[in-house]
Amino acid sequence: MVDISLIIGGPQGGGIESAGQIAIKSMVLLGYEVLGSREYHSNIMGAHSYYHLRVQQHRPRSLKLPVDGVLALDAESVFTHFRDVRPGGILVYDPGTKSTRVDAIQPMAGPLKKRLKSLFDSRGMQPVVESAVKLAEEAGARIVGLPLKEMLKTLSERTGAPVARVSRALNTLGLASMLYMLGVPVEYIEKAISLQFAGKEKVINMNVEAVRIAVDYVREAFGEPESRLPPGPRRGQTMMVATGNDLVAMGKIVGGLGVITYYPITPSSDEALYVEKHSYISIDGPLAEKLGYDKIAVAIVQMEDELASINAVLGAAAAGARASTTTSGPGFSLMNEAVSLAVEAEIPVVVTLWMRAGPSTGMPTRTGQQDLLHSIFSGHGDAPKIVLASGDHVEAFYDAIKAFNWAEEFQTPVIHLLDKYLASSMVSLAREDLDPSKVPITRGKLLDNPPADYRRYEVVEDGISPRARLGSATMVITGLEHDEYGYATEDPVMREIMMFKRERKFKVIEERIPDEEKAVLHGDSEASVALVSFGSTKQPILEALEMLRDEGVRARFAQVRLLYPFPGRLVEEMLEGVEKVIMVEQNLLGQLAMLLRAHTSIKPDSSIVKINGRPLYSFEVAGAVKRILETGEERVVVSHGS
C-alpha cells in the first residue's frame, strides 16, 4: 500500500503553495489520491509557511506525522520541521544555511526560539541549522543537501535569465529533487508544472528546466532512487483537485447562485474569488431556448464592509435571487443585526461562515471550531435560523446547494458552517464525486403570479407564507414587527400571531429535513465507546476508528451535521447503550458538548480538544481515546502541528 506524506516549508511568498500543488498534481497524474493543506502566517512575506500532503491509493482521511520527506527551502523550515521526518525518511535542505543561528531568523516566533535553544543546550550543541540536521540524522533521517544557489546559477545560464528572475524557481529545484528521490517519474512532475502554470509558456519552460537540473544533480550526487513509484489505481482517469473554498463556490454556482457579496477576510475570500473567475456560465438546451441566450452571469460584489455585504444580499434575496455572503468570525460579528432582520423579515439568505482561531483577530490563518454557538445564537431577540456544518470537501459541495434549498423552502437564514482547514486544504476528486443532480434545486413557495390581495406574511398552517419577488406585488419588508401585509404594528395579539408563525416553521424544518442530513452514525453501532463531533474533524475521526479497531478498540462516531435545530432525539438514539461518550472539538469551551447537554439527557464523560490552530490528526484522536479509556481523564488536549 502506498502511503506517502511530505512537508514543503519555506518563507511566506516563496512559492510554497505552488510547490504543494505541483506535488499534488504530480501524484494525481500518476494515479493516486491526495490530501494537502497549506499552513501559513498572517503576513504577506517572510514568515514560515508550509504545505503538508499525504498520498494514498484512496482519498486520504487525515494528514500524517511523521512524514517521509521534508523539503526545507530556508533555515527556519529546517528548525521548524527537522523532528517531523520519520526514521528512513529524507530531509532536503541547503547546506549553505548550516551556520544560520536561531536568533538570526527574525520572523521566527520567540517561544519557538527559546524551545529550540533549550533543546540544543541540553545536547551541548550550538543553536544553528547544522545542529538540527545532525539531530534529524541521529533520529534516522537521510540527509539530502542541495546547493540551491549554485543550482540557480546553472538555471540562469541555461535560460539566459538573471538569477533574480530564476530564483522564483527555487521551490521547483527543491521539490523536483525530493519527488525524484521518492520515485516519482520526471515526466509527471513536468506535466504537473504545465498544468500549474497553464498559459504561461516562459514560466513553464523555466520550471521544467529547473526540474532537469535538479534531477541531474540528484542522480550524480545520490544515484538513482531505490525504487520507482508504480502507477496508482486512478491513472488515466479524469480527476480534479479542489479546495473547500473551490467546492463551496462550485456548489453555490450549480445551485443557482445569483448574487454573492463579500468583504475580504481570511479564509473566506478565496471562495468569492473562485466565483469571480467563473461568474459567466454557459447554458444550453430548453433553458437557453427559454431565455434566448447561451450564458448567464453571477453578480459578485466586493462591498465596503461586512454590514453592507449581508444587507446587500438581503435585498437581492427579497428580489428573488439566490443570494449569499461569505465571511469569517470577525466579519460575522458585524452581520449579527442583519441576521436578526432576515429572521424577522423571513428573507432566504445563505451566510457561509468559515471558522478560524479566535477570539478577536486571534490567529487569522489558523483553523478552529470556536464559532459554533456564535452561529446558532447570532442575531438579537428570538432569532432562530438553520445552522449546517459540513464534515468534508464533498459534503461542502452538496451542502452549499442544500443551504439555498432550505433557505428558500423555509424562508429563513441558513448559516453554512465550515472552517479554515476545509477552506485551504486540497483534495483529489473524481467526476462522480460531484453530481449536482443528487440535490435538485427547489425554491419552496415562490410565486410567479401573486394575487392582487397578496399578503407577504400570510398566516398559514406551516408558518411558511407564499413568497413573491420584490416588485412583483405590493408588499412591505421591514425589521419591525408587522401584520400579514408587512405593515408595522405593535398590537399584542398580532405580535403573538407572528411570533408563533415563525416558531411553527422550525417544527416543520425538524419534520422535513431528513434524519440523514441531521446526523450520521459511523463505525461500530454496537460499540460501548462513542465519539461525538461536528465539522472537519469527521475524516480524522473516521481514520482513528479504523486505527482503534486494528488495536482491538471498538467505537462508534456520531457526526452532528444540523446544529440548529439540534437533532436531540436522533443523537440520543445513536448513542443508545453507550457507556463512554467522548466529545471531539476544536474549541476549549466544549461548545458541542453544551448543546448535547441542553438538548438531550446525555452527559459526556470526556473530551478531546485541539486549540493550537492546526488541523486535527487521526493519530491524535486514536491516541487520546486510548488514553481516556486507560486513565479516565476528563479532557485530553492534543497539540501536534508546527
Curated annotation (Swiss-Prot):
Q: Would the keyword Cytoplasm be found if you checked this record's keyword annotation?
A: no
Q: Name one GO molecular function term.
A: 2-oxobutyrate synthase activity
| Thermal effects | Optimum temperature is over 110 degrees Celsius.
What does its pH dependence look like? Optimum pH is 8.5.
Which controlled-vocabulary keywords does the entry list? Oxidoreductase, Pyruvate
Fetch the InterPro entries from UniProt: 2-oxoacid/accept_OxRdtase_asu, 2-oxoacid_Fdx_oxidoreductase, PFOR_II, Pyruvate:ferred/Flavod_OxRd, Pyrv/ketoisovalerate_OxRed_cat, Pyrv_Fd/Flavodoxin_OxRdtase_N, Pyrv_flavodox_OxRed_cen, THDP-binding
Q: What is its EC number?
A: 1.2.7.11
Question: Which reaction equation describes what this protein catalyses?
Answer: a 2-oxocarboxylate + 2 oxidized [2Fe-2S]-[ferredoxin] + CoA = an acyl-CoA + 2 reduced [2Fe-2S]-[ferredoxin] + CO2 + H(+)
Q: Name one GO biological process term.
A: response to oxidative stress
Gene3D superfamilies per record = 3.40.50.920, 3.40.50.970, Pyruvate-ferredoxin oxidoreductase, PFOR, domain III
Binding-site residues, substrate: 266, 356
- Which is an annotated Pfam family here? POR
Locus of motif YPITP motif? 263-267
Q: What does this protein do?
A: Catalyzes the coenzyme A-dependent oxidative decarboxylation of different 2-oxoacids such as pyruvate, 2-oxobutyrate, glyoxylate and 2-oxoglutarate to form their CoA derivatives.
Q: How does this polypeptide assemble, per the annotation?
A: Heterodimer composed of an alpha and a beta subunit.
**Domains: entry comment:** The Tyr-Pro-Ile-Thr-Pro (YPITP) motif is important for the turnover of the reaction, presumably through its flexibility and mobility.
Identification of the protein by name: 2-oxoacid:ferredoxin oxidoreductase 2, subunit alpha
- Where does this protein come from, organism-wise? Aeropyrum pernix (strain ATCC 700893 / DSM 11879 / JCM 9820 / NBRC 100138 / K1)
